[in-house]
From Swiss-Prot:
Taxonomic classification: Bacteria, Pseudomonadati, Pseudomonadota, Alphaproteobacteria, Hyphomicrobiales
Keyword annotations from UniProtKB, A to Z: FAD, Flavoprotein, NADP, Oxidoreductase
SUPFAM superfamilies xref list: FAD/NAD(P)-binding domain
Origin: domain of life: Bacteria
The family this protein is said to belong to: Belongs to the ferredoxin--NADP reductase type 2 family.
Enzyme class: oxidoreductase
EC number(s) from the headed UniProt entry: 1.18.1.2
The protein's name: Ferredoxin--NADP reductase
Positions contributing to FAD binding: 17, 36, 44, 49, 89, 124, 289, 330
Length: 342
């Protein structure tokens, strides 16, 4: 087991509610690490509707999911939160009163005084491609996220998909791989136009092999890919060499391992105390779409409110002997100093 990362608070989920919770906790001198199964911050805003307008953020008539994420990241910059992306919490073990040892599927271990679940509707789980036997290669040579780019250096990479994730990793990994093949079922891509243009430039320069069709079979031994068979749209067949495959077929939402953490659940949601947003387990809080209480509205602004109240209770676990005086950022010079305001 790797050495534990010690932090005051660990937040599960780096969507808008998790990010704003960093701000509220930071004002109280609470240090935060965040874990998210996605490979980028922003949660549903970044993954499902980055360019979709949002009209119900107070004081902002219209902002996109991407724009909101960028603004929140700028707002929390003074507090230097640490992000662990592309990882999913697997186990939560109580080690104090309160205190928790938390382990991710990547083997990262945290020890925290407070755990905040801000996981939206649950964990985004990658959709498995409809290729026979693909599960035998998962985790060794078939990957649904890129955790460390250097692991793909010098490899023959096969990327499958036509959205932003497929295009982004095509562009990012192309300079370091030995060879790269991009497979999509049609010659029409859903990603950002600029990314599509850059991808086609790689094809034109011979740095990327674009195949229009579908993967029908994989070849390899002991979990290590060696090649793939592609049925092209003209009904011909292509055989390619590959030792790493990245399929991007979208995501589904599942509750995931949260169900095994000893929390009370109601219809796959976590009931909370509306004064503190604490769960039935002392020291574990739930904010945002993952929680439930009478009158709950699944709005981003509701999650912001919940994060503010959560922080006022969480700080008492972090600093049990410290008297916390509520202050306003408009008038408190100490808070303004933390924010870097002159």
């Amino acid at each position: 087991m790797s050495e534990a990362i010690k932090t005051d608070v660990l937040i599960v989920g780096a969507g808008p509610c998790g990010l704003f919770a960093v701000f509220e906790l930071g004002l109280l001198d609470v240090k935060v690490h965040l874990v998210d199964i996605l490979d980028k911050v922003g949660g549903q805003c970044a993954e499902l509707y980055p360019e979709k307008p949002i009209y119900d953020i107070p004081g902002i008539p219209m902002i996109t999911g991407h724009g909101l994420t960028e603004s929140l990241m700028e707002q929390i910059k003074p507090f230097d939160p640490q992000f662990h992306l592309g990882e999913m919490i697997e186990t939560v073990e109580q080690i104090g009163d309160p205190g928790f040892r938390v382990t991710t599927d990547a083997g990262t271990v945290f020890e925290c005084k407070v755990l905040v679940v801000a996981a939206g509707g649950g964990s985004f789980q990658p959709k498995r491609p409809p290729v026979p036997g693909v599960e035998h290669y998962e985790g060794k040579s078939v990957h649904y996220a890129v955790r460390k780019m250097d692991e793909f250096r010098g490899k023959d990479i096969l990327i499958v998909g036509g959205g932003d994730s497929a295009l982004d990793w095509t562009l990012n990994l192309n300079p370091i791989c030995k060879s790269m093949t991009l497979v999509h079922r049609r010659d029409d891509f859903r990603g950002a136009p600029h990314s599509v243009e850059q991808m086609r430039q790689l094809v034109a320069s011979g740095k990327l092999d674009l195949k229009i069709g579908q993967i029908t079979a994989l070849q390899g031994e002991n979990g290590q890919l060696e090649g793939a068979t592609i049925k092209l749209n003209d009904n011909s067949t292509a055989q390619i060499k590959c030792d790493a495959m990245l399929p991007f077929f979208g995501l589904t939402m599942k509750l995931g391992p949260v169900a095994n953490w000893g929390l009370h659940l109601e219809n796959n949601l976590i009931p909370v105390d509306t004064g503190t947003f604490e769960t039935n387990v002392p020291g574990i809080f739930a904010i945002g779409d993952i929680n439930t209480y009478p009158g709950k509205l699944k709005l981003i602004l509701s999650g912001f409110h919940e994060g503010a109240l959560m922080a006022q209770k969480a700080v008492k676990y972090v600093y049990p002997d410290k008297r916390v005086v509520f202050q306003y950022t408009t008038s408190s010079t100490s808070l303004q100093k933390k924010l870097g305001v002159n």
